[in-house]
Amino acid sequence: MKSTKELRTVAVRVPPRTTGAERRSAKAVLEVAAVCAGTGMALIVASDGAAGWRLARVAGVVTVVLGVLSLSRRRSITGLAVAGALFGLVVAPAGGAIGFPSLSRTGWSLRAGGGVLAALAGLVLLAVGTTLAARAVPGWRRLLGVPAALLGAYVVGMPVAVAVFATNVARTPLGSETPADRGLAFADASFVTSDGVTLSGWYVPSTNRAGVVVAHGASSTRSTVLDQAAVLARHGYGVLLFDARGLGRSGGRGMNLGWYGDEDMAAAVGYLEGRPDVDPGRIGAVGMSMGGEEAIGAMGADPRLQAVVAEGATGRGIGDLAWLDEAYGIRGRIQQQVSRLTYAMADLLTDARPPASLRSSVAAGAPRPVLLIAAGRVDEERLAGEFIREADPARVELWVVPGAAHTDALRAEPEAWEARVTGFLDANLRPAR
């Protein structure tokens, strides 16, 4: 016979079990929460964009919900619990990051209500699903739940959060400075994109018949590129600074991955093309970070852009991250997969379509030249720049600025920046003979 102590030990090792009634109740909760979460996400993804694309995104959400619900037919609740927890891990941060800010800014709307519903239902899925899944794991193995939860948060939660914040950008107000603070005469400018968004900017007239679009980075405005614009204006270039859509005084919805860049840049080039002081065959672009990526993308799609300077450009899609594998090995491959989920989620949350990779845009822009500027203190910029340059080393120049931070090359090396950038533009925006 076993001793009392041995019996107690055995009893401790028996995992708690759910009764049939508890199992049915838990299944019902998970099913209702999954439907509510799916409804909320459907309201979010159907809130903007072309009708066909809205329908496709809603169909994707419905497919996921049906997949989760299909697991409720099984006798074991574990599969449903795990699927529910994973679904909750996605929709809770996505719904919360969209719903509550929308509610505070604009009050109740389909988008705000959908976000709040998805967030609350996602939390229920996450809590109930995780609890039930943990009950199915015996003894010490439950301790593995902590690192598993952290891994899940990194692999799923973080990409979702990044995608949500990239596609739901708070409007950044225009700064108080204008070109006049740099001693430049200017005029207000506005122009409309091909999809009907009005963009706002400043224009400094040209004295050398060439024009340059100057594009800012994510979550900022034209005010942040005044220093770069002033350098170009001193050399006679007409300079158009504009707020990307959804930022500053421009209309539309912001997108920090730069996926609307082709449309925005095309409209900006069109504005310069129509200026009487600008030769339409002498138009270039200088972009910082997201603006640099947009300028490269625009060159691949718009033959009117004759030369591009891109500082701090690394990528805006999964095709731009192929260098991670070679540079960082297994860590790079993991980062690629995490980023793949980020871009997939972003694609679900916005009407903007994923753009061509920077490398393919450079190839499509041949034979027009590109100058890439990378921060010496940011290894990823150099590595990404080398990867982009491989598309056509003969016409893509990479300048790594020692000691410079992200988009800080002008401050770190003002004389060198002025000489390199204006020299590049002078050489490639010359009058046609």
Where are these regions (language model features)?
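Alpha/beta-hydrolase active-site loop
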Residues: T224, M255-P276
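An N-terminal hydrophobic leader/cap segment in hydrolases
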Residues: T4, V35-V62, R142-V192
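Serine-hydrolase catalytic core
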Residues: F191, S200-W202, S220, M345-L425, ...
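The serine-hydrolase catalytic nucleophile loop
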Residues: A218-V231, A244, G251, L383
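Membrane-embedded alpha-helical segments of integral membrane proteins
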Residues: L80-A133
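Hydrolase active-site cap/lid region
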Residues: A170, A298-D351, S361-A363, R368-P369, ...
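Alpha/beta-hydrolase fold nucleophile elbow
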Residues: P276-S289
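Short beta-strand element of the alpha/beta-hydrolase
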Residues: R209-G217
